[in-house]
From Swiss-Prot:
The keyword Magnesium applies. This is Protein phosphatase Mn(2+)-dependent 1K. It is found in: Mitochondrion matrix. Mn(2+) 1 binds at D127, G128. Serine/threonine-protein phosphatase component of macronutrients metabolism. Forms a functional kinase and phosphatase pair with BCKDK, serving as a metabolic regulatory node that coordinates branched-chain amino acids (BCAAs) with glucose and lipid metabolism via two distinct phosphoprotein targets: mitochondrial BCKDHA subunit of the branched-chain alpha-ketoacid dehydrogenase (BCKDH) complex and cytosolic ACLY, a lipogenic enzyme of Krebs cycle. The modification Phosphoserine is found at S248. Transmembrane segments: none annotated. One of its GO terms (molecular function) is protein serine/threonine phosphatase activity. The gene is PPM1K. It is an enzyme of class 3 (hydrolase). Disulfide bonds: none annotated. Keywords: Hydrolase, Magnesium, Manganese, Metal-binding, Mitochondrion, Phosphoprotein, Protein phosphatase, Transit peptide. It comes from Pongo abelii.
C-alpha cells in the first residue's frame, strides 16, 4: 500500500474508518454537488469521496494493497503511514497475567506491564531467588529507568541493555548501603519486552525466564536460557574465575550455588562471572485478522516444568483466541 494513499485517507476522515471505508473522487471534485457522508458497513459498497487511482471506482481497504481486510482492532494511523501498511492498536485490555505460588512458602515472582508512551508498550517478568528483594527492586524501578532512556536512545536493544546494567548497578548500591546482609545473595531473572508502533518487538533477558511468540500455532523462541549448560556461558564463567558444579540431580550450578549464569543481583557471584548484560532479540510483529493471531508469552522458568515450547504455545493459543493478545 502506498504511503501517499494512506495519508490521503487520513486527511479524508480516516478516523471514522472501521473495517471498510468507501470513498469517491467524482463527488469530491464536483463542487456543485452535495458532499456525501462516509459509510462504515460490511454490506454492498457505496459511493465514496475519493479513489486511489483516479478511476472513479469505489475504494476499499483492498484497493490499498491490503491482502486481508479482516482487522478487528483499531488502526494506529501514524505508524500505518510510517510503515505503509495498516497496523492494529494493541490495547492493554488485551494483556493477561497471572502468578501462582506453587509449593513455595513465598512467591518471589513479579510481573509488570504499562504504556510508556503513545508508541511504546512495556511487559516484564522477574523471577526472584534468594528472597524477593532483587525482583521487587526491578519491579519498582525498571519501568522508570526505561522511561528516562527513551528520549535519549532510539535503538530499543541498546536501550534495554543500558537499563539492565543501570538497574543492576543501582541494586548493588542499595544492597551495600543496607543493613540487611541477605540482599547480597538476592537475585532475579529479568525478561522485558518493548513493543513500539505495534510492529517492532524487542526482547531482552537475563536468566531463564523464557519468552516465546505464538504465531499461527507455531512457537518462535525469543530468548535463550542463560545456564551453565551452555558451552559459551560455561567457558565465560571459568575465564572470570568461577567454576561449575553439579548437584545430586545432575544440574549444573555456578560455584555450586546458582543455576543461571546471568541475573540482576547475586552480588556475591559478580566476581565469578555472573553478569547482568542481557541478550536481545528484535523482530517485526505485524499481523492481519484473527486467523493470523499473535500471542507473546513470558513465563518464569518454574512454570514451564516438563512442558516444551510447542505444548505451551498450543495451550496459550487456545486461551487467547483474539488477535494481539499478550501474556
Amino acid at each position: 500500500m502506498s504511503t501517499a494513499a494512506l495519508i490521503t485517507l487520513v486527511r479524508s476522515g480516516g478516523n471514522q474508518v472501521r473495517r471498510r471505508v468507501l470513498l469517491s473522487s467524482r463527488l469530491l471534485q464536483d463542487d456543485r454537488r452535495a458532499t456525501p457522508t462516509c459509510h462504515s458497513s460490511t454490506s454492498e459498497p457505496r459511493c465514496s469521496r475519493f479513489d486511489p487511482d483516479g478511476s472513479g471506482s469505489p475504494a476499499t481497504w483492498d484497493n490499498f494493497g491490503i491482502w486481508d481486510n479482516r482487522i478487528d482492532e483499531p488502526i494506529l494511523l501514524p505508524p500505518s503511514i510510517k510503515y505503509g501498511k495498516p497496523i492494529p492498536k494493541i490495547s492493554l485490555e488485551n494483556v493477561g497475567c497471572a502468578s501462582q505460588i506453587g509449593k513455595r512458602k513465598e512467591n518471589e515472582d513479579r510481573f509488570d506491564f504499562a504504556q510508556l508512551t503513545d508508541e511504546v508498550l512495556y511487559f516484564a517478568v522477574y523471577d526472584g531467588h534468594g528472597g524477593p528483594a532483587a525482583a521487587d527492586f526491578c519491579h519498582t524501578h525498571m519501568e522508570k529507568c526505561i522511561m528516562d532512556l527513551l528520549p535519549k536512545e532510539k535503538n530499543l536493544e541498546t536501550l534495554l541493555t543500558l537499563a539492565f546494567l543501570e538497574i543492576d548497578k543501582a541494586f548493588s548500591s542499595h544492597a551495600r548501603l543496607s543493613a540487611d546482609a541477605t540482599l547480597l545473595t538476592s537475585g532475579t531473572t529479568a525478561t522485558v519486552a518493548l513493543l513500539r508502533d505495534g510492529i517492532e518487538l524487542v526482547v531482552a533477558s537475563v536468566g531463564d525466564s523464557r519468552a516465546i511468540l505464538c504465531r499461527k500455532g507455531k512457537p518462535m523462541k525469543l530468548t535463550i536460557d542463560h545456564t551453565p549448560e551452555r558451552k559459551d556461558e560455561k567457558e565465560r564463567i571459568k575465564k572470570c574465575g568461577g567454576f561449575v558444579a553439579w548437584n545430586s540431580l545432575g544440574q549444573p550450578h555456578v560455584n555450586g550455588r546458582l543455576a543461571m549464569t546471568r541475573s540482576i543481583g547475586d552480588l556475591d557471584l559478580k566476581t565469578s562471572g555472573v553478569i547482568a548484560e542481557p541478550e536481545t532479540k528484535r523482530i517485526k510483529a505485524i499481523q492481519y485478522g484473527t486467523e493470523d493471531n499473535s500471542t507473546a508469552v513470558v513465563v518464569p522458568f518454574g512454570a514451564w516444568g516438563k512442558y516444551k515450547n510447542s505444548e505451551i504455545n498450543f495451550s496459550f493459543s487456545r486461551s487467547f483466541a483474539s488477535s494481539g493478545r499478550w501474556a
